[in-house]
Every structure is written in C-alpha cells, then in structure tokens.
Amino acid sequence: MASSLMSNAATTMAAATTTAQANMVAPFNGLKSISAFPVTRKNNDITSVASNGGRVQCMQVWPPLGMKKFETLSYLPPLSEESLLKEVQYLLNNGWVPCLEFEPTHGFVYREHGNTPGYYDGRYWTMWKLPMFGCTDPSQVVAELEEAKKAYPEAFIRIIGFDNVRQVQCVSFIAYKPASYGA
C-alpha cells in the first residue's frame, strides 16, 4: 500500500514538472546586432518636410473682439426648435438627466476677482429648478426652456446632460442667448 501511494505521488509530481517546463519561456540570449537591420538615409531638405499644401491660404482666424464663443455647438448658427429637440433626445437616449442652468450677466468664463481659476469666474451657473430626473420627452425640456426664457429674457440659458451613475456632466450647450447679445 505504501508503495502504491509512493508511485501515485511520483507520477503526479512528474506530470506537474513536465507541464511547468512546457510553460517556461526561453532564456534571454542578448540583444541582436544592429547591423542586421536595414539602414535608410533620409534627405532632410525642404521637400521632405510635411506640408498642408495650399490649405493655408483658405484658413481663417476667428475674430476675438465682439464675437465670443461659449461651449459645445457655439460655432454653429442658433439651433432651430427641431435641432434642439434632437439634441435633447440624444441626451435622453444616452440615459443622461437633462438640466437647465442660466447666467443673467455673463455667458462665458470671466475673471472678476483674481487671475486664477476659482468659483467666481463664470464657470458655475444658477440651476433652473431641479434636474429633470425621469424625463423621457424632449418637449418637456423645451417647455422648461421657454419658461426660463420668459422669467429671465436677458439671461444666457444652457442645457446640460448629467450622468447620475458616474456623477459627471457629460454635455453642455447654450440653448438661448439674449437678444441684447446680438450674436
């Protein structure tokens, strides 16, 4: 009996050793000689430099005076109601909670109380009511936007999409600019 236990243990040990040896990596043999790689000589004259061709002639710079831009979608023309409904539907399709915020005086980041970023530099807007948890219809959000426009006709109003699982703001865009802004 003792001999049969001994042979079973030896067989098990031998099987474990062979599988361990099969999984081992080959030993390191050193670096290969660099002369084995092909050598290319590059010509560093002006013709080998990357070029964007003639596109430089048609590029324009956004005029920085009197035409401030804000956030996502601000370089597009004002959104029609149909486009606005599609954007809000996108928020809802992604499972984000729509929320309206407004800023009565500045619709952009500004530094009034210092030269370093902080709370009072235009990043934090006033929330319009509460986030619209459970909202499934984009027209509900647009109705709230219209109500906010009536209450604050001279304010900038934006719609944000808030992910309540990750607890982050995923998207934000200006939905209304006051008529006095003129852009």
UniProtKB/Swiss-Prot annotation:
Induction: Expressed at intermediate levels. It comes from the Eukaryota. GO terms for molecular function: ribulose-bisphosphate carboxylase activity. InterPro entries: RuBisCO_ssu, RuBisCO_ssu_dom, RuBisCO_ssu_N, RuBisCO_ssu_sf. One of its GO terms (cellular component) is chloroplast. It is found in: Plastid, Chloroplast. SUPFAM superfamilies: RuBisCO, small subunit. Keywords: Calvin cycle, Carbon dioxide fixation, Chloroplast, Photorespiration, Photosynthesis, Plastid, Transit peptide. One of its GO terms (biological process) is reductive pentose-phosphate cycle. CDD domains: RuBisCO_small (cd03527). Residues 1-57 form a transit peptide. The keyword Plastid applies. Its main location: plastid. PANTHER family: RIBULOSE BISPHOSPHATE CARBOXYLASE SMALL CHAIN 1, CHLOROPLASTIC, RIBULOSE BISPHOSPHATE CARBOXYLASE SMALL SUBUNIT 1A, CHLOROPLASTIC-RELATED. Belongs to the RuBisCO small chain family. Heterohexadecamer of 8 large and 8 small subunits. HAMAP family: RuBisCO_S_bact. RuBisCO catalyzes two reactions: the carboxylation of D-ribulose 1,5-bisphosphate, the primary event in carbon dioxide fixation, as well as the oxidative fragmentation of the pentose substrate. Both reactions occur simultaneously and in competition at the same active site. Although the small subunit is not catalytic it is essential for maximal activity. The basic functional RuBisCO is composed of a large chain homodimer in a 'head-to-tail' conformation. In form I RuBisCO this homodimer is arranged in a barrel-like tetramer with the small subunits forming a tetrameric 'cap' on each end of the 'barrel'. This is Ribulose bisphosphate carboxylase small subunit, chloroplastic 4. It comes from Mesembryanthemum crystallinum (Common ice plant).
